[in-house]
């Protein structure tokens, strides 16, 4: 039998249910725009919270209007409440590693075990006390039931500690009073007060320790509020706390039973009505049965609580305790210091996963592998633009980007603030668009693709992501680079640049000449040309061998800094490929225009972008209609604000006819494509020429 066929405890006992499409009548009053129907789920077996426990009605509640502007006192219960829920409970070594992590993060109250219930826990408490592992500003907390012998054993375990909290509890809920204890209210209250008296008695036997006490009416959410207050007040009378030595009353959602607002109402009611409130630290301990533990904790804190117990990444019984990481970083994301250090979230996660022997989910807030990752195209584009805007704002303010107010769409915090990099912020799959592709190419490969090239290349990646089976899988940065190289860098036919020699003009506005060795369909040949810069000269030279290139747009940038830095160049070009005419071939008239428009190159000083460039090239044999001294004009596109010429005005190079070429008009059909070419090289000149070659080869496909 395979794993998928193996029955679990539920299907084996009761048989697997079959999903049946809901087809019952709509509920009374259901609007016509809602097409949902009644299901066959046995909802009659459950009842509203107000019927199971009691309705909670709080007049003039204040918590909805409160803004959380400070951190609560935290208590980490990973070593007890978290540990008891593990498939493989922590060994002493794993416990110590967890304890040390919690101390380093800044937790000042740490529940370290249930020493009366486990020899392993007892030994661990003794170990950290005897080895001096507890810092002076950290208070350990130990858990015990209210039975006298368990309380005695608990105090023995903590002997010698500088300070300790003894946390005693008993369940007070309606359900547990009936089915577990089979006791009435007074009898259950007596369990709590007897436990409190035993704690006071034992504390007197160990005067070297600063003892504090915590009491939990366990299953508080299933307990009537008046009764929960009654039991807490009775315990308080025994402990006799003061504002300087307060008692902790912990109000756990041992089982989450209703919505967070109801829990918050109950906390505000208790905060208003507990006796001797100034001597009480009101604590929360939410579980996550309904998936709203974080909301319950935050609203309960706004409702008047002072302290929150929980576990890192929400470990704990069933669906877990409230997640201290989420609570702390929620505060951080709104500019409130959690007073805990989360600056290396991956180290925290690795330690927790090792100690608990359980993985942290990829989607777990703040710590999961995918929580700072966008696959959606629109999300990626917004993140990319947000990060760019941050850099521009930092430059404008003349400050470091890390000192700027964080404002990036879809990322509630800067991943770097918790030790992450931007490497995994954007990942590409079939849902991604140009923004994600552009981001990966920039951050992983150093290429700042022009916008139109982003659009073009993203279509290549989209096809890869969709795959032959249409699965929509992820495209890794390496796969993306391989696709880019194959598409833009690899083609070497029909044209391959071997080397070039450039003679730059001595005077501003002069003519640059180039002599280049190229291969055309594998045959090596030498070409030469002139222009207002190396790019224009190379384009002019290519026209002599049948490649008419009009440069429509051009970008360049350095890919990195340093002596071994590479440069990237991008050329958008209209490429017309016409092989040199063969003898007797009906060809091209000498006056037919070849179009080129190329912006001024970096380093070309003294020439306005609109200035014409004159190339005087000798007439070729058989060329009619032009004297050898007639100028050939190249003009680059108009720049913004340039007067007197539109960017769309035609720019022409009269290229010489080849031997035997006669009788072809400019209107004759030719192969012409507008394509992008990319070049990468140590020098920007070589990169720009490679970009032209790339464009020619892509046009030839």
From Swiss-Prot:
Single biological process term from Gene Ontology: L-leucine biosynthetic process
Cellular compartment(s): Cytoplasm
Pathway field: Amino-acid biosynthesis; L-leucine biosynthesis; L-leucine from 3-methyl-2-oxobutanoate: step 1/4
Ranges for region Disordered: 1-40, 581-670
A GO term, aspect molecular function: 2-isopropylmalate synthase activity
Co-factor(s): Mg(2+)
Catalytic reactions of this protein: 3-methyl-2-oxobutanoate + acetyl-CoA + H2O = (2S)-2-isopropylmalate + CoA + H(+)
The entry's keywords: Amino-acid biosynthesis, Branched-chain amino acid biosynthesis, Cytoplasm, Leucine biosynthesis, Magnesium, Metal-binding, Repeat, Transferase
Positions annotated as VNTR repeat: 575-593, 594-612, 613-631, 632-650, 651-669
GO cellular component: cytoplasm
Binding site for Mg(2+): 81, 285, 287, 321
CDD domains associated with the record: DRE_TIM_LeuA
Record-listed E.C. numbers: 2.3.3.13
Matches recorded under Gene3D superfamilies: 3.30.160.270, Aldolase class I
Domain Pyruvate carboxyltransferase positions: 72-346
Class of this enzyme: transferase
Domain of life: Bacteria
The protein's role, per its UniProt record: Catalyzes the condensation of the acetyl group of acetyl-CoA with 3-methyl-2-oxobutanoate (2-ketoisovalerate) to form 3-carboxy-3-hydroxy-4-methylpentanoate (2-isopropylmalate).
Database matches in HAMAP family: LeuA_type2
PANTHER family, sorted: 2-ISOPROPYLMALATE SYNTHASE, PTHR46911
Subunit structure: Homodimer.
Full protein name: 2-isopropylmalate synthase
Originating species: Mycobacterium bovis (strain ATCC BAA-935 / AF2122/97)
Gene (name only): leuA
